[in-house]
Amino acid sequence: MMKDINRIKVVLLEKKKTNKWLAEQLGKDPATVSKWCTNSSQPDLVTLRKVAELLGVDIKDLLNSSNPSVNEKVIIIKNN
């Protein structure tokens, strides 16, 4: 079984926001956001940063990763 990479669905619930709301804010198809929420696909890191900003959380709060490579990329994105 594939491990969940992101926590977008969990954070949306915590913030009382919907997939549809997030899709509208990002100008994305709701089906795309749904795939992110079920971890069947992942947003790119730039989009993930936008999601974090919209939800008022740190980008790391959206990830379930102990993978140093992913964490390193997140640090680079945050600093740019």
Residue ranges and their predicted role:
Residues 37, 55, 63-66:
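DNA major-groove recognition helix of helix-turn-helix
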